[in-house]
Amino acid sequence: MKIAVLGDRDTALGFKLAGAHEVYAFEDTPLEMERLRNKLKELVERGDVGIILITERFAQRVEIPDVTIPIILQVPDKSGSKFGEEALREIVRRAIGVELKR
C-alpha cells in the first residue's frame, strides 16, 4: 500500500524527502482547492493507497470522506499544529480502533 501526501509546497517537499510514495503540492486558492478535492477523491477510490496525509489547513477547506481504507490523517504544516490532545486521540482511535487515555 502506498502513502500519498496532499499539502502545500514546503510540506509536500518534506514528505517527498522522507520517502512518501506520492506527493501532491497545492496553493491556497479556490482553483487549487478544487484540484485538491479531485485528487483526494481519486486517491480514495484507488485500491493501492493505504494512507493519505493532508495538511490541517487544507483539510479544513475540503470534505474529508469517512472511509476506513485508506486512512486519512491530518498533519501540521510549517505554521504548526491546530490540533489539541483530544483531536489527536480521535485520529488514533479511528486509525487503530483503540482509544488511548492517560
UniProtKB/Swiss-Prot annotation:
Membrane topology: Peripheral membrane protein
Stored Pfam families: ATP-synt_F
Keywords per UniProt: ATP synthesis, Cell membrane, Hydrogen ion transport, Ion transport, Membrane, Transport
Locations listed in the record: Cell membrane
Quaternary data: Has multiple subunits with at least A(3), B(3), C, D, E, F, H, I and proteolipid K(x).
Protein name: A-type ATP synthase subunit F
Gene3D superfamilies: ATPase, V1 complex, subunit F (3.40.50.10580)
Functional description taken from the UniProt entry: Component of the A-type ATP synthase that produces ATP from ADP in the presence of a proton gradient across the membrane.
Any single GO BP term: proton motive force-driven plasma membrane ATP synthesis
Superkingdom of source: Archaea
Primary site of residence: membrane
InterPro entries cross-referenced by the UniProt entry: ATPase_V1-cplx_f_g_su, ATPase_V1-cplx_fsu_bac/arc, ATPase_V1_fsu_sf
Family named by the database record: Belongs to the V-ATPase F subunit family.
HAMAP family, A to Z: ATP_synth_F_arch
SUPFAM superfamilies attached to this UniProt entry: AtpF-like
GO MF term list: ATP binding; proton-transporting ATP synthase activity, rotational mechanism; proton-transporting ATPase activity, rotational mechanism
Zinc-finger keyword on record: no
Species of origin: Desulfurococcus sp. (strain SY)
Residues making up the signal peptide according to the UniProt record: none
Cellular component GO terms, alphabetical: plasma membrane
